[in-house]
Amino acid sequence: MTSVTRSEIIDEKGPVMSKTHDHQLESSLSPVEVFAKTSASLEMNQGVSEERIHLGSSPKKGGNCDLSHQERLQSKSLHLSPQEQSASYQDRRQSWRRASMKETNRRKSLHPIHQGITELSRSISVDLAESKRLGCLLLSSFQFSIQKLEPFLRDTKGFSLESFRAKASSLSEELKHFADGLETDGTLQKCFEDSNGKASDFSLEASVAEMKEYITKFSLERQTWDQLLLHYQQEAKEILSRGSTEAKITEVKVEPMTYLGSSQNEVLNTKPDYQKILQNQSKVFDCMELVMDELQGSVKQLQAFMDESTQCFQKVSVQLGKRSMQQLDPSPARKLLKLQLQNPPAIHGSGSGSCQ
């Protein structure tokens, strides 16, 4: 009975006990007692694990199971010495503490994977290439999603199973062709290549370092330009302030009465308003424009008449020359006239010849 009461007291005051008391108990034990302690601790841990399994397997039995389990533990504790009981309850307290910590800070596990999803990867042959397996996985996952979507759409209004399956088959064919194209292009194979990725990473790092250098250079250049701009702005402000002070110093106020009585006022008042004059004479300018247009048209007509008359005179002179040449006998004068016909004379000469 004393052992039971002592064990209950230790069980109630277990969380408050310190590590120094545990160390004192372990140092006071002999090697035989230490071996007995370890065996007892193993038995108690096994009992605690059996208790957890029993509670997890039958949580609905209530207090009967707890009472029987407590009686079994008490019967075990009667066969142990006080030191062994304290050591066993210390181990039990530590195991309970670890269990409580695990229960409070336990990481939540993910939901179990659906069995059909795992069968997708198992149905693909391992002997195929990695790119081919990836394409098959894409196609099979699409077909699996179609199969899971079909029962949900059957209850909707206006759903046609035949059209849905026809569209699904056409889409699967398109996806198959697309996956084959990706395989032939080498896009799927790039997903499994590490060397190219490392090379691209190195090139990316080099380009990033180069860009950082350019950014630092541009930032320094921007700072210099900003400093130069501030310098010029300060100089411009100083120049404006100086100009305003000089204008205030050299400014001379003139009264309006003296300005109105000067000779400049008379000159400004006698200045004609040319814009008003032009507006008044706009009709005259329009008539002059019409007259000039008519004169230009008449000059063009006279020039055309002169061209036609010259052409007519040339034709008449040629005809008269042919007639006169036919009446003459072969002679040196005829040859001379032929030469003259080859070089046509001027208008006045032809007119005089025709008159003769």
Curated annotation (Swiss-Prot):
Its main location: nucleus. One of its GO terms (biological process) is cell division. Component of the MIS12 complex composed of MIS12, DSN1, NSL1 and PMF1. Also interacts with KNL1, CBX3 and CBX5. Interacts with KNSTRN. It comes from the Eukaryota. It holds the Pfam family MIS13. InterPro entries: Dsn1/Mis13. GO terms for cellular component: azurophil granule lumen; cytosol; extracellular region; fibrillar center; kinetochore; MIS12/MIND type complex; nuclear body; nucleolus. Residues 1-28, 73-93 are annotated as: Disordered. It is found in: Nucleus; Chromosome, Centromere, Kinetochore. This is Kinetochore-associated protein DSN1 homolog. Keywords: Cell cycle, Cell division, Centromere, Chromosome, Chromosome partition, Isopeptide bond, Kinetochore, Mitosis, Nucleus, Phosphoprotein, Ubl conjugation. It comes from Homo sapiens (Human). Residues 8-25 have a biased composition (Basic and acidic residues). Residues 75-89 have a biased composition (Polar residues). Part of the MIS12 complex which is required for normal chromosome alignment and segregation and kinetochore formation during mitosis. The modification Phosphoserine is found at S28, S30, S58, S77, S81, S109, S125, S331. There is a cross-link at K253 (Glycyl lysine isopeptide (Lys-Gly) (interchain with G-Cter in SUMO2)). PANTHER family: KINETOCHORE-ASSOCIATED PROTEIN DSN1 HOMOLOG.
